[in-house]
Amino acid sequence: MSTSNYINSFAPAKINLGLRIFGKRKDGYHELQTLMAPISIGDRIEITLLSSGIEFESTGDFDVPKDSSNLALKAALLFLSHHGLKTGLRIKLTKIVPPGAGLGGGSSDAAAVLFSLNRMLAIDETMENLIRLAAQLGSDVPFFLLRKPALCTGRGEILHPTSSFPYPRKGLLIYPGFPVSTPWAYKTYDELCKKGLILPSPSQESDKPVNDLEEAVFSKYLWLPAVKKWIQSHFNPEVCLMSGSGSSVFALFSKEDPRFFNDLIQQAQAYLGPGCWIRLFEILEQF
């Protein structure tokens, strides 16, 4: 819903259908290849234009920073500064996506703010320029501007939209109730590679999608491989992976029968207990 001074946007989470790492770059980032897809679970961003001042409010299922370290607010400040605008804003974030879960919630919020302000303020910035601006906020932010599945390379900011998606659309998503730090995950991966405890990507060819960060994250958070093994042994998914740098684990199924998914989520809730955030979702081909 939008008017000239108000817009209400959906900011979907994403999953990574594989994440391959091809070494560390001179700028400190890692060279990546990952297929990312938006899903039907997401936050909501409401923006109202004001005569002056910047107001930010966050409600919902999870607490997030309410200062300029929040990516949604940071995106708004960057957009206004980039275009030399003094417009006042009220931003209301309804937080549904757990932070620190490898689901890109903060990045999606930032992209939704950039996309919305570009429309509301009639800037008509090109997608290329918006993506360039988004890359200043984080490696995953450009992907959410594309609004469809994409193969992402570089540090994740180089986008290759995909028209063919070879995986099932329906799945189960589990957040264990604790976050994983992305810098820690990559640092641990590098350390384990140096010790020869993890083989680099070229040595790990696979017919199915692989997340190269799993071994690093699983080495500390033993609950995650246990959950992945439980899903694989009980429900035989087509794909079961940790998303991004964790901590969420997801599974995709080719089943269509609603009874299967009802049984799936009931068994997951019974096995994992009330401390886990468990949801069914669908992959979005466009949003």
Curated annotation (Swiss-Prot):
Single GO biological process annotation from the record: terpenoid biosynthetic process
List, from the UniProt record, the residues annotated as the active site of this protein.
K14, D140
Q: Which SUPFAM superfamilies does this one have?
A: GHMP Kinase, C-terminal domain (SSF55060), Ribosomal protein S5 domain 2-like (SSF54211)
Keywords assigned by UniProt, alphabetized: ATP-binding, Isoprene biosynthesis, Kinase, Nucleotide-binding, Transferase
Entry's EC annotation: 2.7.1.148
Q: Which domain of life is it from?
A: Bacteria
Listed pathway(s):
Isoprenoid biosynthesis; isopentenyl diphosphate biosynthesis via DXP pathway; isopentenyl diphosphate from 1-deoxy-D-xylulose 5-phosphate: step 3/6
Tell me a Gene Ontology molecular-function term this record carries.
ATP binding
Per the record, the similarity remark reads: Belongs to the GHMP kinase family. IspE subfamily.
Q: By what name is this protein known?
A: 4-diphosphocytidyl-2-C-methyl-D-erythritol kinase
The organism is Methylacidiphilum infernorum (isolate V4)
